[in-house]
Amino acid sequence: MMNSTYIIVFFLVLWLLLFVGFMIVYSNRKKKAVSFVSDNNDKAIVHLYCSKTKINGRNLADFNPITGENLERVVALVPGRYTIEGVYKTTETRLNKTINIRSENISMDLDLEAGNTYSIAMYLYSPEERQEYENGKTDEVVLSVPLTIVVGSDFIKAYIICYKEK
């Protein structure tokens, strides 16, 4: 009886310590993101939800990215035209089956303006479908690249979309 009580107390204390630790990490990440945006208000902030990312042919690490709240990579770029390339991933659930979707290396040209925040990610719906679903309350679409992906016998449509926050 006493042994099971110690085990339960041990796991509760362990859970509490881990919970507090992760809350501190999340809080620090959020503060860092806010500080990053305020320190770079004269640049374009770009949230990249992709891997193997290159900007103008250079590795993403050359641009000193930070990790955002959703584990995306965030960079501050001086205004101008950029070629951004990367491999985009997402998942979809169909009939209780999870399908992992991954693009090839996609390259796109974007004109970025100072003081704006952009997000580039893969979505399973078009900008028009999202705008209809959100009753027109969506960010401005800067670029949309439709993809057709065939996984086994399933037909999947996906889009790489760049949104500019309003």
Language-model features: locations:
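A short tyrosine-centered beta-strand micro-motif
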Residues: 80-84
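Short loop/turn and low-complexity linker motifs enriched in small/turn-promoting residues
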Residues: 1-76, 87-166
